[in-house]
């Protein structure tokens, strides 16, 4: 094992700077002459995506086969941190087998709005639940000697303009909603690394945000690992290094090294800043490489497939079961309808896409079951094209069956990295099919596949609804077993399903192309809004049915937590997820009506009862006091609410809590809309009162951070032409129903990323020349680009020669 302190004394400043950026898309720099190995990083929130051939960061090129587990959005419905730890351990095993040192996951973004195209990669709208699950994944991954890298830190809630948007959020909301999940993950999971997000937070890029990285992450939480940029996410590398960012990825080449050298020479940063970052990076490199050298180069694919199936079983959510239609008895004549039954959708699109070791198919699993499958019909075109013939054939089959199993859902491109959803609806051809089938056979079980929320105005057309989410490569077997009663669905929703998208508090301006993203709703995301505003929803947070029933009784409560008895009052074994919420009545602060502060799973046989204890931690009663700039507790009476969902509260006890707050955070601000939870249309004036300062107005500037999608603002025909070509290509891909992820990435990419993602082929000086061209200085800009290109080639060659010791 290398001694980092001694090694730093041997390295030249140039060598040190070179180590703080990647060498290839998913590899760090190695320096064999100093005993520093090169290590692999790989995407892997729900399955490893190591690309042995040509690498890319969007999941476009094939990767090495790996187990595709249910997505985070699915596993969150299990409310099972221990299951997350098992999945994490399997991910760690596969990473070690493929010589990957860092797994880029889990994803911890808060689900502010269900239209976020990447919601399937994230756990929940609740930071406590998300943090607990993420900590489990992290512990599991790192138990195999591999480093976990939770992402994206922080306040990154949309794909639109994700590389250049500025999240404007008040400090209390930042702390209580968007950072608490990361805090739990860091303190309880102890990750070796963390990935910064692309966006700015209150005017400063997350990757160079001193408040986030140095004051909170490293200072308050004690994180001592490596902060890794998202791919192409570095804006000012030197400022990032100074303020706590460790490794710039993927491969910016020699220009990045020269940037740091110049910053040291100018006094912008010091060599001690460089050393501090290397003291975070090098132990990770040495430790993971040593663990990988001792790890087996194979894993038990069958065992991991079985784990993926069990994870899918625990993640299924039964949303409707009218007349106890489910489970289906052996011998039931069933018609299987829907393209998803034969061509499964089990994961999302983008950088998390896994090349699965195998994929189970629901139709095959149903045929192998004790049901009498009388036939299958596709029923609809999965990409939304109307097809009367498909619908007619499906209806004809439905008339011959006792029960119809209809598989519906979102197609592959509806949920993807780089692209936010345009609505929460299922394709109309699927809804039309459901209505047509219901007219000839009302006994319909809908199996729904999606990575996030969908509107369900069609719910009355089916008798049962089983939410399969994106269940991974073994999800089909789990669904078949749930339909036939071999498995009792026990999952509960980790996010609220509204009646309509318009009810979501951030609906009015989510994913606009403005430079600023204003978090006007404050604390009120998800159930925190719906319960406070007393707004009806389709399915509340924490909701999920079972084939059995449970009774809660004999609750005892104090400041430490609660204990209660749970009894299975039904006729079959089942698992109940008991949820503990905290409510403060007559609060002097504005706050959500109730907040999740604990949960527990219990599996019981029919008639069995068990005593449960749910402990409260140091986050149970705290709030961020924006005036005192610290965590405090408001004293007084609290209600501890125990229930089967946020709306289905079974037991309640009141306790008295000693307070610490001495200064009222909002005594001089009129924030009536926040006290009422009336945040659907927050005015500029009210939001500025919450922020404590004027709302920043993002203006389009022709500089390094101009995105390619904004080149129509350029003063150059070349810029207009590039913008026009990209726009046309994007429109064509949309019309084909298959948006091009590569074009989408480029469209939202700032010019500076050209210098961060081309392995040194383009320097920042060349980007500055392009900016001059776009500003209208056509000839000077062209000359600058040519000059900087020649200079870049020469300097890169000289630097590589020095680093090789030639």
Label each region the model flagged.
Residues 646, 653-723:
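Charged, amphipathic alpha-helical linkers/stalks
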Residues 689-806:
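Long, low-hydrophobicity ectodomains and other hydrophilic envelope-associated domains
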Residues 618-665:
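Terminal connector regions
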Residues 1-619, 623, 637-641, 646, ...:
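Glycoside hydrolase catalytic-domain context in secreted enzymes
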Residues 47, 368, 507, 572, ...:
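A generic signature of intrinsically disordered, low-complexity regions enriched in glycine/proline
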């Amino acid at each position: 094992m290398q001694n980092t302190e001694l090694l730093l004394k041997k390295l030249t400043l140039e060598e040190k700077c070179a180590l703080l950026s990647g060498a290839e898309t998913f590899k760090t720099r190695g320096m064999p002459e100093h005993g520093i190995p090169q290590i692999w990083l790989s995407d892997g929130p729900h399955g490893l995506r190591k690309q042995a051939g040509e690498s890319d960061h969007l999941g476009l090129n094939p990767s090495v086969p790996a187990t595709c587990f249910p997505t985070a959005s699915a596993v969150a419905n299990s409310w099972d941190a221990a299951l997350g730890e098992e999945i994490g351990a399997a991910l760690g095993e596969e990473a070690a087998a493929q010589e990957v040192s860092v797994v880029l996951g889990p994803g911890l973004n808060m689900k502010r709005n269900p239209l976020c195209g990447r919601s399937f990669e994230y756990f929940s709208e609740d930071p406590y639940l998300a943090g607990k699950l993420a900590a489990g994944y992290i512990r599991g991954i790192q138990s195999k000697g591999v480093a976990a890298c939770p992402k994206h830190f922080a306040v990154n809630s949309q794909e639109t303009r994700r590389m250049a948007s500025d999240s404007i959020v008040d400090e209390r909301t930042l702390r209580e909603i968007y950072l608490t999940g990361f805090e739990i993950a860091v303190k309880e999971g102890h990750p070796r690394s963390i990935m910064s997000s692309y966006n700015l937070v209150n005017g400063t890029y997350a990757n160079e945000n001193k408040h986030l990285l140095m004051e909170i992450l490293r200072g308050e939480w004690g994180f001592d690992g490596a902060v890794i940029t998202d791919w192409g996410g570095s804006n000012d590398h030197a400022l990032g290094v100074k303020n706590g960012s460790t490794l710039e990825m993927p491969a910016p080449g020699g220009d990045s090294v020269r940037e740091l050298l110049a910053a040291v020479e100018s006094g912008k940063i010091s060599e001690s800043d460089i050393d501090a970052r290397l003291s975070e990076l090098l132990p990770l490199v040495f430790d993971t490489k040593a663990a990988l050298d001792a790890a087996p180069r194979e894993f038990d694919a069958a065992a991991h497939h079985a784990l993926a199936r069990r994870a899918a079983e625990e993640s299924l959510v039964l949303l409707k079961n009218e007349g106890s239609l489910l489970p289906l008895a052996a011998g039931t004549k069933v018609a299987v309808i829907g393209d998803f039954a034969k061509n499964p959708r089990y994961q999302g699109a983008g950088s998390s896409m896994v090349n699965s070791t195998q994929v189970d198919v629901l139709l095959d699993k149903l045929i192998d079951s004790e049901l009498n499958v009388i036939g299958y019909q596709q029923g609809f075109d999965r990409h939304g094209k109307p097809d009367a013939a498909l619908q007619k054939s499906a209806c004809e089959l439905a008339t011959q069956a006792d029960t119809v199993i209809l598989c519906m859902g979102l197609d592959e491109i509806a949920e993807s990295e780089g692209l936010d959803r345009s609505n929460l609806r299922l394709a109309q051809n699927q809804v039309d099919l459901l209505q047509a089938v219901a007219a000839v056979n009302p006994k319909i079980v809908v199996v729904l596949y999606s990575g996030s929320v969908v509107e369900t105005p069609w719910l009355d057309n089916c008798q049962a609804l089983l939410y399969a989410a994106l269940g991974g490569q073994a999800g089909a077997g789990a669904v078949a077993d749930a339909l036939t009663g071999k498995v009792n669905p026990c999952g509960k929703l980790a996010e609220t399903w509204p009646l309509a998208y318009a009810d979501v508090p951030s609906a009015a301006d989510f994913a606009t192309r403005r430079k600023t993203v204003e978090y006007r709703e404050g604390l009120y995301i998800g159930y925190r809004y719906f319960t406070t505003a007393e707004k009806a929803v389709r399915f509340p947070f924490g909701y999920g049915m079972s084939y059995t029933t449970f009774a809660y009784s004999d609750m005892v409560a104090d400041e430490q937590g609660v204990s209660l008895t749970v009894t299975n009052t039904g006729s079959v074994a089942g698992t109940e997820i008991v949820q503990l919420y905290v409510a403060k009545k007559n609060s002097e602060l504005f706050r959500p009506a109730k907040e999740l502060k604990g949960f527990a799973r219990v599996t019981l046989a029919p008639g069995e009862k068990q005593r449960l204890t749910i402990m409260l931690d140091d986050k149970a009663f705290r709030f961020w006091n924006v005036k005192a700039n610290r965590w405090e507790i408001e004293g007084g009476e609290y209600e501890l609410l125990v229930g089967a969902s946020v709306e289905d509260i079974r037991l309640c006890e009141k306790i008295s809590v000693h307070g610490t707050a001495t200064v009222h955070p909002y005594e001089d601000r009129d924030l009536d809309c926040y006290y009422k939870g009336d945040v659907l249309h927050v005015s500029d004036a009210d939001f500025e009162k919450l922020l404590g300062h004027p709302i920043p107005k993002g203006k389009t500037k022709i500089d390094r951070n101009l995105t390619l999608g904004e080149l129509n603002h350029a003063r150059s025909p070349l810029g207009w032409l590039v913008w026009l070509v990209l726009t046309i290509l994007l429109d064509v891909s949309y019309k084909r129903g298959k948006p091009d992820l590569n074009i989408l990435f480029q469209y939202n990419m700032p010019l500076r990323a050209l210098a961060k993602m081309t392995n040194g082929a383009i320097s920042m000086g060349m980007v500055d020349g392009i900016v001059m061209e776009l500003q209208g200085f056509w000839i000077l800009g062209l000359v600058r680009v040519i000059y900087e290109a020649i200079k870049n080639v020469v300097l890169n060659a000289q630097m590589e020669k020095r680093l090789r010791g030639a």
